[in-house]
Design a protein with these regions (language model features):
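N-terminal polyanion-binding entry modules of DNA glycosylases/AP lyases
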Residues: 1-119
Length: 120
């Protein structure tokens, strides 16, 4: 990742801070809700997964897929990389375009293996 990109991200964060407008699932809960943005590693990963799942669908459908990922304890990079593609696709089926999104989630996880969340 280029230093210029990180510099721009840092400037934006310094000036605007965390916006907290994306719903996340709090520990011990089932439904993502607005709570000031992601605070834990798992919540940050959930937001990234959510950005993939919400494409070309409603938030309600994406949220259902996120709930299913949480129920199967799949908000985890290694678990996404190790699960069979068709099983992952079945889990996120409510989000629509589930075969393509399963591939995208695996690609995102490969990227995050190379560039961990704490570096972004």
């Amino acid at each position: 990742m280029s230093n210029k990109f990180l510099e721009i991200c840092n400037i934006l964060y310094k000036n605007y801070g965390s916006q907290g407008w994306w719903p996340v699932t709090n520990k011990g809960e089932r439904l993502p809700k607005y709570s000031g943005g992601p605070k834990t590693y798992k919540q940050k990963l959930e937001v990234m997964f959510g950005t993939v799942l919400v494409q070309n669908t409603t938030w309600k459908n994406a949220q259902t897929a996120i709930i299913k990922l949480n129920e199967h304890d799949l908000i985890d990079i290694d678990k996404i990389l190790n699960i069979e593609l068709d099983e992952l696709a079945g889990t996120i089926k409510p989000s629509g375009y589930f075969n393509q999104k399963a591939i995208k989630l695996k690609s995102l996880c490969l990227f995050l293996k190379k560039f961990p969340i704490n570096v972004l």
